[in-house]
Amino acid sequence: MFRGATLVNLDSKGRITVPSRYRTTLNEASEGQMVCTIDLNQPCLLLYTLPEWEKIELKLAALSSMNPAERRVQRLLLGHASECQMDSAGRLLLASTLRQHAGLTKEVMLVGQFNKFELWDEQVWYQQIKEDILAEQTSQEPLSTRLLDLSL
């Protein structure tokens, strides 16, 4: 399980260095084999271990290519999916098309989200957090049953 937000640098070759606290888990889960794709709703990337991504691929394969919405999701997620191998120094090379999609420049936020990471441009991440907090503070919508059961 991945949690927390960490600032990492994107080097001139388009690589990020995975924080050491995650490396053992990633090596045990997938021998450092990762898959990165776009997020359909946010300007960020999604980074999965290969076994986690394979679960998603099975779900995507079950969608109908005859349904335009389902085909669109398949095209976007699978079409942007890029395998990346963590090297011995803990670095991952991110495809240039993915970096461009998320607007990643020098400083990147690596955000743990249970079974995956999100990769955000640092400034976009902090702006999104401000917007999310404001939305929660001003929301008039009733909480879902699942959120009502959440006790912090």
Swiss-Prot record:
GO terms for molecular function: DNA-binding transcription factor activity; transcription cis-regulatory region binding. It is found in: Cytoplasm, Nucleoid. It holds the Pfam family MraZ. GO terms for biological process: negative regulation of DNA-templated transcription initiation. Its main location: cytoplasm. Residues 5-52, 81-124 form the SpoVT-AbrB domain. Transmembrane segments: none annotated. Signal peptide: none annotated. Keywords: Cytoplasm, DNA-binding, Repeat, Repressor, Transcription, Transcription regulation. Coiled coil: none annotated. CDD domains: MraZ_C, MraZ_N. One of its GO terms (cellular component) is cytoplasm. Forms oligomers. Belongs to the MraZ family. Negatively regulates its own expression and that of the subsequent genes in the proximal part of the division and cell wall (dcw) gene cluster. Acts by binding directly to DNA. May also regulate the expression of genes outside the dcw cluster. This is Transcriptional regulator MraZ. It comes from Proteus mirabilis (strain HI4320).
